[in-house]
UniProtKB/Swiss-Prot annotation:
This is Virion protein 6. It is found in: Virion. Keywords: Virion. GO terms for cellular component: virion component.
Length: 112
């Protein structure tokens, strides 16, 4: 599977601050971050969308009401080195190690 080295993230501004919306991966399907924001505002998605305080998936996760979004800006952010370094399979990798490595990658890109 091909994994990205960069991601398109939407920075949303509300009265309470600025947050980042990341693309959502469900299995092999990825929903674009702007599609998540637009869908929530049109009623196709739930109005409370998951956002991160920083442009990093490891930052605190919270939910905001999409109807309170004032502005939305798309940005490109780099995937952290600790994740991209896992893309290359080591020569001496066991099946158990591969499962852990791929699980770590998939957990990073899944909704948390």
């Amino acid at each position: 599977m091909n994994y990205p080295k960069r991601e398109k993230v939407v920075e949303v501004s509300l009265a309470s601050g600025t947050y980042s919306v990341f693309p959502r991966r469900l299995g092999v399907t990825t929903n674009d971050a702007m599609s998540i924001v637009n869908g929530a505002m049109k009623g196709a998605e739930l109005p409370m969308i998951p956002v991160h305080k920083l442009a990093d998936r490891d930052s605190e996760l919270t939910y905001v009401n999409a109807f309170q979004i004032q502005t939305a800006t798309e940005n490109i952010v780099d995937v952290p080195e600790r994740i991209t370094s896992l893309y290359t399979k080591p020569e001496d990798e066991t099946p158990e190690d591969e499962e852990v490595r791929l699980g770590t990658i998939n957990n990073y890109f899944s909704l948390r």
